[in-house]
Amino acid sequence: MDGFGSSQAPAAYREVEWIADVFVIGMGIGWIINYVGMVYGSLKGRTYGMAIMPLCCNIAWEIVYGLIYPSKTLYEQGVFLSGLTINLGVIYTAIKFGPKEWTHAPLVMHNLPLIFMLGILGFLTGHLALAAEIGPALAYNWGAAFCQLLLSVGGLCQLISRGSTRGASYTLWLSRFLGSFSVVISAWLRYKYWPQAFSWLGKPLILWCLFAWLVVDGSYGVCFYYVKRYERRIGHDSDRKTV
């Protein structure tokens, strides 16, 4: 599966291919920082940071394009496998500490391992079906866009429904945002300099996905700021009452 490079690339793209490669590495760095930070924050706060369904979708995508349809580019393959490995730690912390976040829903609280197993299996078959329908190279990109939207919406909903920043931080938000934004830059370079293969990146649905992601992830930063400020105010008021 060719994700970001191919022997068929025109000369115009080959001149800027190294820039696209740098942003692919930037994507990997951003997401690895995010995953490691998520595991660390989960262990420290005894909670989990990524919403359940986005986590299942994300790890299923990494399995498909890290193991089943691996990239022909070594560094890209390394990014995916590194992310997959660390993501297993994210799932571990979610299963270990998730029950206390779901005391209001016993069915979820007592069945998190089963929910994760079924969720990953469901998204895994979905990604494979998409690859069979439109080909692995296209499905790789469309699947990534879906994962990103689901992750952004899930993260925002989790922050709002919890009314708390536990399991989250500015570092996690920014590393996720910068990692995903690196993908946007590399995709733009392919669209600009390799239109024969990537002109579809300028289609309305892709542009809508990009706009929706920017709005949702931008909103996450704003909501995080206000939730954090509320937590500080409540903590300050509590401190004054105990004096």
Swiss-Prot record:
It comes from the Eukaryota. Its EC number is 4.2.3.-. The chain crosses the membrane at residues 19-39, 48-68, 78-98, 112-132, 134-154, 169-189, 205-225. Keywords: Lyase, Membrane, Transmembrane, Transmembrane helix. One of its GO terms (molecular function) is lyase activity. The keyword Nucleotide-binding does not apply. It holds the Pfam family Pyr4-TMTC. GO terms for cellular component: membrane. It is a multi-pass membrane protein. InterPro entries: PaxB-like. Induction: The onset of expression occurs at 48-hour-old stationary cultures and the steady-state levels correlates with the onset of aflatrem biosynthesis at 108 hours. Expression is regulated by nsdC. It is an enzyme of class 4 (lyase). The keyword Transcription does not apply. It is found in: Membrane. Terpene cyclase; part of the ATM2 gene cluster that mediates the biosynthesis of aflatrem, a tremorgenic mycotoxin with acute neurotoxic effects. Synthesis of geranylgeranyl diphosphate (GGPP) by AtmG (a GGPP synthase) precedes condensation of GGPP with indole 3-glycerol phosphate, followed by epoxidation and cyclization by AtmM (a FAD-dependent monooxygenase) and AtmC (a prenyltransferase) to produce paspaline. AtmB is also essential for paspaline production, but its exact role has not been identified yet. Belongs to the paxB family. PANTHER family: PTHR42038, TERPENE CYCLASE AUSL (PTHR42038:SF2). This is Terpene cyclase atmB. It comes from Aspergillus flavus. The lineage of its organism: Eukaryota, Fungi, Dikarya, Ascomycota, Pezizomycotina. The gene is atmB.
